[in-house]
Amino acid sequence: MEKAKHVTWRLLAAGVCLLTVSSVARADSLDEQRSRYAQIKQAWDNRQMDVVEQMMPGLKDYPLYPYLEYRQITDDLMNQPAVTVTNFVRANPTLPPARTLQSRFVNELARREDWRGLLAFSPEKPGTTEAQCNYYYAKWNTGQSEEAWQGAKELWLTGKSQPNACDKLFSVWRASGKQDPLAYLERIRLAMKAGNTGLVTVLAGQMPADYQTIASAIISLANNPNTVLTFARTTGATDFTRQMAAVAFASVARQDAENARLMIPSLAQAQQLNEDQIQELRDIVAWRLMGNDVTDEQAKWRDDAIMRSQSTSLIERRVRMALGTGDRRGLNTWLARLPMEAKEKDEWRYWQADLLLERGREAEAKEILHQLMQQRGFYPMVAAQRIGEEYELKIDKAPQNVDSALTQGPEMARVRELMYWNLDNTARSEWANLVKSKSKTEQAQLARYAFNNQWWDLSVQATIAGKLWDHLEERFPLAYNDLFKRYTSGKEIPQSYAMAIARQESAWNPKVKSPVGASG
């Protein structure tokens, strides 16, 4: 019996030792892989390609190996066979750069003028505009003209300037005689609306000879919107000229609202505008007459225009103006003008209740405020405060223990390693793809996993992607607490306020950059 116990103990001890050794080996293996990964990247940066080729095969099990493989392919993309790119994309369907590689290689095959090879590599329309233009040009080059012209038309109808690769496609479409001149007018309208004067001028200059009169008028209007009345009087009234005049009129209104206001009757007569079209012009000017510097006449005209308007956003702007000036009578008037659907917004329900309280209709007001309190948001909280009741925050709890199946895939392994190397933006791209592919329950678990790992920005990102608005802990993590405590200590600004501003502006992404260069 004692001998049996001794044998059992030795077996258990051996098992524990094996588990320990195995665990250490795995840890050492990851450390070794990271070290080798850093060496390969440094060798690559120093163009020591013999070192790269020698070391890469030993890293095939490392989570970030696909990124090295991607770099290997794209560094020499002009010499890669299609099968290499196809195999890489198929082997890494969830890798963010692999998703863009297909379009890049379509463009490379177009550079080689391998049109049949392009269509064999990409039987379906690729993702980027440049690649799509090359794809449809390949269709034309291989005798599939009807598909090419359909694609050309879709790519043509935009107010943006398209990539140079599209010029070839548009050129053969035009030469085929299949491009309707009206397509020019439609794209000119879109470009004019987008403020793309350069494109308007180019397109007008390319129009057929029998369209030169309207082309010249369009160019003059695009270069000087203040000539809109001349344009309206000298061109025949059509849907196109009315739309062009409306776009130019909006530009005039931005610069001189009073000039635009006085111009409306003449413009309406010259272009034979109906009441809806005239109201569209009134709305444009009314938006510009919301300041404190308007005259009594302008204010009266503005309110008359808004009273006739069907624009919900314009009426809401007028409601806010009444609130800003403390105009209670105006508040009542303009709230009443809102369509029923808009009146159901939290903001306007609150102010309707506010007006009812002012008139002594307390029961009706409290009914609205109690209903409002059941929602999540600023006005529901204010509603509770208004009637002196406690607002109950609804907080959903994500599972503390995350399903291991969610954390053991190649995507999560890449996220972990990217975060280790402080490649936050690349990690965010991986994370976004991963979260997007999961159910709401799984998204909540991923948010919790990020929270537990102190990946604060990824926790926030998961709650946004999954619309997990009531997962407040993961949505508003108390990130960088010690840092904020240190830098707000002794200052007038409260720590909570500093953290709230940082969360609002960056969503806790330390690498985020604003359009004007602010970061973190």
Predicted feature residues:
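Catalytic glycan-binding domains that act on GlcNAc-containing polysaccharides
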Residues: 70, 300-302, 307, 359-370, ...
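N-terminal signal peptide c-region/cleavage motif recognized by signal peptidases
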Residues: 20-25
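Generic helix N-cap/helix-start motif at coil->alpha-helix transitions
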Residues: 28-36, 47-48, 60-67, 79-80, ...
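Alpha-helical repeat scaffolds
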Residues: 51-55, 80-92, 114-124, 146-158, ...
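Bacterial N-terminal signal peptides that target proteins for export
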Residues: 2-13
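Alpha-helical adaptor scaffolds
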Residues: 72-74, 86-90, 102-107, 282-293, ...
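Residue-level signature for tetratricopeptide repeat
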Residues: 42, 71, 75, 108, ...
